[in-house]
Amino acid sequence: MAGPPNKKQKREDYRTARENGEESKELPKKKFYRQRAHANPFSDHRLAYPASPAQMDWASHYPAYAESAAASEGTEEPSTGSDSSSLKKLKQDVEVADIGCGFGGLTVALAPKLPNSLILGMEIRAQVTEYVQERIKALRVQEKESGLFQNASCIRANTMKFMPNFFKKHQLSKIFLCFPDPHFKARKHKARIVSTTLAAEYAYVVRPGGIIYTITDVEDLHNWMVTHFNAHPTFERVAEEEQEADECVNIMRTETEEGKKVTRNNGPKFVALFKRLEDPPW
């Protein structure tokens, strides 16, 4: 006689049932999407990513913002030999990125606060990404009449390797880096989400006047991020008074899963915002 299914089998059965069932208002349960706390960004995770931003199928992530077939035909550009000509276009670009979004607390909280912006959670862990996607699907069903959460989505991505594949120059108005892996050991610092190289990539995808939001409970990592952004000529740290007046800062402090954990443990939260400056005229 077969014994009861193990935890792994239960998780697989639960996710399969959600995939095969009708649209559900019920939020997914985290216990069925467990995964390690961190993933190695230098490993080959067999990720799917576009060759360029023009080849990204955004319409499947934001169907409510996709142009009609007639509108797409009217604005169709000459074919360049890529698959981009067959993709349905969006009425507007994604402009807010929650990098390392975890279980999607911030992504979901920002959606109703920024109703005119398309918000994208980006997460490297497969099962965690699946959880956020199911969470957003359920919220869309719950808010079908109001239309909330149509502006939020999540993809599995390694932004340390492929961020320019998703976003064109000056596309983003906000990037959130919330409670990233501190990588305490010196030999692991190269895996931190902020570095000299990555600061240059952030400068490329963030438009002038845009903001990068950072928060961590590790003071050493906070100082590291401040040092690297201050060293980049196109970023300037936002003054504390302006920082505290930004409603996104309070959301960032309170709505992420890691932020809630730090609050429960009475831990510190170190916040720093950096504004993208105008490019020099030359």
From Swiss-Prot:
GO molecular function term, any single one: tRNA binding
Compartments it resides in: Nucleus
EC number: 2.1.1.33
Xref: SUPFAM superfamilies: S-adenosyl-L-methionine-dependent methyltransferases (SSF53335)
Annotated segments matching region Disordered: 1-36
Highest taxon, organism lineage: Eukaryota
Bias type Basic and acidic residues, positions: 10-29
Catalyzed reactions: guanosine(46) in tRNA + S-adenosyl-L-methionine = N(7)-methylguanosine(46) in tRNA + S-adenosyl-L-homocysteine
Keyword annotations: Methyltransferase, Nucleus, RNA-binding, S-adenosyl-L-methionine, Transferase, tRNA processing, tRNA-binding
Its biological purpose: Catalyzes the formation of N(7)-methylguanine at position 46 (m7G46) in tRNA.
Assembly description: Forms a complex with trm82.
Record family assignment: Belongs to the class I-like SAM-binding methyltransferase superfamily. TrmB family.
Name of the protein described by the UniProt record: tRNA (guanine-N(7)-)-methyltransferase
